[in-house]
Structure formats: structure tokens, C-alpha cells
Swiss-Prot record:
The active site is at 177, 270, 281. Disruption phenotype: Growth retardation, narrow and dark-green leaves with elongated petioles, root growth inhibition and reduced fertility. The double mutant atgk1 and atgk2 is lethal. Its EC number is 2.7.4.8. The gene is GK-2. This is Guanylate kinase 2.
């Protein structure tokens, strides 16, 4: 218990020696925090790009500067920042004079994700994670062999609860087909770009199909969640295995046919495939069913021998069987004052408005229940405004 001061007040007015006998003079909007023997300097722009906030590291022992690989999409530069060191290798960064939906960010410098990325990249790494108020419902991963009816079940959910569920838009490196729209059917991207983003840990799952990459990015899931909807991922067992190993906390459901004979009858009833294609799908389905039942990935297994009963069971699993369709509820924004001081008290951050004409407003951030993190969002923030004495 007790009060601890924030570590944001160092604006580097005297600069640092850059290791070559020349002082580096950060701009007066830069903010630094000290963790051990290293100062993390936040400000300016990233690699000359004025749209993204820069990060530099100064090692007090070697007196050298370094520019780390910065993962994730960070905050845009603004008129000033406050920063405070948090436990578990994170720095809370608050943008001054910004609305609450764009003011709270976390810079991860020594989390499990960062340590993993350092091993993969072989260099210094930091990562941004946007802070989001409140929690969100877990995304839903639904897998099953072709012809089992999982697409129909998902369509029924989307039709009955259009404001509750949403699809993530996958990425692919193949060329768009006729009538396909970028950002609607797929995010069409360059192979080199997608390979780099996969290496940077931005994808939950990916696969190479006929020489083209397909995958689900973390951002595409977060965008659905940010809109107030619960994200549904319709992916195969291989993709579900990758999602299970990621930082995403999801519900995993596998849809099984009542029998292989029933599945074969359904595939033949489509009348859209040759005998060779049907036999290939059956072989793939048999392998996928065995993997789905024995992999330990899926907490729930549904047997679709009756569509209406299976749909009712699915809704029960998701806790929505007796719910009426509802619209998403928007969280009211709170503007953070341009001039303020920051104090840390246990898991709470107290932001006190300062300057002339202030209204003695104090904003309290409760971080006791935060979850998630880079390369996705950090959720669970509780934010409130109180009158200070």
C-alpha cells in the first residue's frame, strides 16, 4: 500500500551522450522512463514516419543509444505524454489532451511476448498495445470438416444476432477474383509484406495454399471486438491449433457429422463436385475429425445430426439461448486534460488536472483487472472521473 510517484517528469532537458562524445538532444515533447540501467525514450517519430510515435533506448552502462524493432501499431505523435513504469515489463503511456479511446497505451519492454520476439529476431524489441476500457466476450473458433454444416450454423447465429457477432476478414496474397472487394472478402496484400508481419507475430494463424498465403491477423479480430461484437473464426484444425498456442483467449468448438456415411450423403447432395473431389474431401474430413477429437484443442464438440437441435446446443454453449438480439452499448469517452500530473497507487493511476482554470478534476485508472496485451489490445481498464478536494 502507499503512494508512489509517476516516472514521467523527465523531459531530458540536458540530453544524453550518444556514445560518440556528442550529445543527443531529444525534443521537449519526449518523455523517458528508467528501468534498471536502461532509459526508454518515447517521442518523435518512428523511423522517420511522422504518423507513428518513436522509441529509443539509452543504456547507462555502455552509454549507447539503440533503436529497437517496434512491433504493433502505436499511438500517433501528439503534444505530450506521461509515462509510468508498471510491473511485468510494461510502461503505461498516456497521451495528453486526448479522448479516452485513444489516450491509453502500453509499451511492452520485457513481457513473455517480447522475450519470444527477441529470440526470433535476435535484436532489441518493444511492442505497442492499445488500452481499451472494459472487457470483451471471448472470440469463438469453430472448426469442422467440409459439409458438416458449420457455415450454416454460423449464418444462423449472424442472422438471429446481427449486432452481437461479427467475422474477422482474413488476409491473402493471391490476386482478387471477380467481384471481390479488398477489406470485405479479404485483405489482399503482398507476399513480402505478409511474411514480415507473420515474422513480427501479427498473425494468429496462417497457411500456404497453392503457393498463396492465407491467414487471420490479430488486428482483424480486435477490430471486430472494438466494434462491440463477438468475433467468429471459421478455420480448420491446423489454424485452430495455432490460435490455441497464441495469446488469444477464445472458445474452441468442433462440429462433427453424425457419421462418415451421413457426411458423404451431404457432399453428394450438393451436386457440385466430381467423384474424385468427393473422395478427397472425405479423406481430409476423416483426418480432420480424428485430429479434432484427439488434439485437446477443442473444449466443446457438437454433433450435427439435427440442425435445429445442434443450433440450440451451440447457443446454450455461448450463453445466449434466451437472449433477445441487442445493440452494442458505447462507452462514454472522457477527455484527458492537456496539463496534468500522474501518481501511481498500487493498481490505480491517479491523473490530476493542473493549470489555470482547472475544475479539480481527477481521473482514476484501475488496472487491477487488465488482460491481453501485445500484439493485440490490453483490455479490462476501468476509468472514472472524480472531484478532487
Amino acid at each position: 500500500m502507499g503512494e508512489a510517484p509517476a516516472f514521467f517528469v523527465d523531459h531530458l532537458e540536458n540530453g544524453y551522450t550518444n556514445g560518440f562524445g556528442v550529445k543527443s538532444e531529444p525534443k521537449n515533447r519526449d518523455t523517458s522512463v528508467l528501468i534498471g540501467d536502461r532509459s526508454f525514450v518515447i517521442g518523435g517519430n518512428h523511423e522517420g514516419n511522422p504518423l507513428f510515435l518513436g522509441v529509443q533506448i539509452h543504456d547507462k552502462v555502455t552509454n549507447k543509444w539503440s533503436s529497437p524493432s517496434v512491433l504493433g501499431t502505436g499511438p500517433k505523435p501528439c503534444k505530450g505524454y506521461s509515462a509510468i513504469v508498471l510491473p511485468k515489463g510494461r510502461i503505461l503511456v498516456i497521451k495528453k489532451g486526448s479522448a479516452s479511446d485513444d489516450s491509453i497505451w502500453f509499451l511492452e519492454v520485457d513481457t513473455p511476448f517480447i522475450r519470444e520476439q527477441k529470440k526470433l529476431l535476435g535484436r532489441e524489441v518493444v511492442a505497442w498495445s492499445k488500452g481499451v476500457r472494459g472487457n470483451a466476450e471471448k472470440p469463438i473458433v469453430i472448426s469442422g470438416p467440409s459439409g458438416v454444416g458449420k457455415g450454416t450454423l454460423i449464418s444462423m447465429l449472424m442472422k438471429e444476432f446481427p449486432s452481437m457477432f461479427g467475422f474477422s476478414v482474413s488476409h491473402t496474397t493471391r490476386a482478387p477474383r471477380c467481384m471481390e472487394k479488398n477489406g470485405v472478402h479479404y485483405h489482399f496484400t503482398d507476399k513480402t509484406v505478409m511474411e514480415k508481419e507473420i515474422k513480427d507475430g501479427k498473425f494468429l494463424e496462417f497457411a500456404s495454399v497453392h503457393g498463396n498465403l492465407y491467414g487471420t491477423s490479430i488486428e482483424s479480430v480486435e477490430v471486430v471486438t472494438d466494434s462491440g461484437k463477438r468475433c467468429i473464426l471459421d478455420i480448420d484444425v491446423q489454424g485452430a491449433r495455432s490460435v490455441k498456442a497464441s495469446s488469444l483467449d477464445a472458445i474452441f468448438i468442433f462440429v462433427c457429422p453424425p457419421s462418415m456415411k451421413e457426411l458423404e450423403d451431404r457432399l453428394r447432395a450438393r451436386g457440385t463436385e466430381t467423384e474424385e473431389q468427393i473422395q478427397k474431401r472425405l479423406r481430409n474430413a476423416d483426418a480432420e475429425i480424428k485430429a479434432g477429437k484427439s488434439s485437446g484443442i477443442f473444449e466443446h464438440k457438437l454433433y450435427n445430426d439435427n440442425l435445429e437441435e445442434c443450433y440450440k446446443t451451440l447457443k446454450n454453449l455461448l450463453g445466449i439461448n434466451d437472449l433477445a438480439p441487442v445493440n452494442g452499448v458505447e462507452v462514454e469517452g472522457i477527455n484527458l486534460p492537456k496539463e496534468h500530473t500522474v501518481t501511481k497507487m498500487d493498481d490505480k493511476i491517479l491523473i490530476q488536472e493542473t493549470g489555470e482554470g482547472t475544475k479539480n478534476k481527477m481521473i482514476v485508472l484501475d488496472l487491477s483487472s487488465i488482460n491481453g496485451g501485445a500484439p493485440g489490445r490490453t483490455r479490462g481498464i476501468v476509468l472514472d472521473t472524480v472531484k478532487s478536494s
